[in-house]
């Protein structure tokens, strides 16, 4: 089952539809099933199109119920509904902030909750949460996007420990920059405040440098199948050739700071009882 927001799954940096080509059946969801027309025409009955707004919890439960009823079982659930929001923290409105969290975080939570009873009953299954390098590190201008992905990372790590005994696996896929429309027409942008013009320009230049060699979404197909087919899949895996170096530098910086301030941390514990 593949929930998506607006775009068909093949326009995401993680494309799981090679499962169809090897004989699997897929329930693909979108708010408007017309966006899934090409998939149905290409793959026929192997693709079950379902309408779903992932921010509607009841609708998520109903879509998962229908998918299970029509397909007979759920082997893999791929949560890749999401979009990017560009805006410095001061610029983001309440409505914009709530919508970013509703789609990117709560959407994945509702679909996950809806699928878990079926996966528990059958004694196996794999939940793929499409996160981002933005769930590990953080950059200016996309703070609310980071909040949504860090939340996804947190509940998914907890979930993996909660459901391991039921034979259910959880994997967070963390892509870096790919040649998709993530920062294009599918993105949302807050009204800019002139006070941030200088840092905005610097941020966009840094982003352009990071995106100088974007990844090919088509190459993720074999990667996602390798993760799904693995007997012991990872809890986290990067997609792309840049995230590991970036995350390593980020975590080394955190460790350095934690160690430098360890004496204060320990002092904050207070005297032992």
Residue ranges of model-derived segments:
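Substrate-binding pocket helix/loop in short-chain dehydrogenase/reductase
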Residues: 88-89, 96-98
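Canonical Rossmann dinucleotide-binding motif of NAD(H)/NADP(H)-dependent dehydrogenases/reductases
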Residues: 1-27
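SDR active-site lid
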Residues: 165-233
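The beta1-alpha1 cofactor-binding region of Rossmann-like NAD(H)/NADP(H)-dependent oxidoreductases
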Residues: 52-62, 94
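Residue(s) in the substrate-gating loop at a strand-loop-helix junction
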Residues: 132
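Active-site helix of classical SDR
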Residues: 112, 148
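A glycine-rich helix->loop->beta "capping" turn
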Residues: 45, 66-79, 85
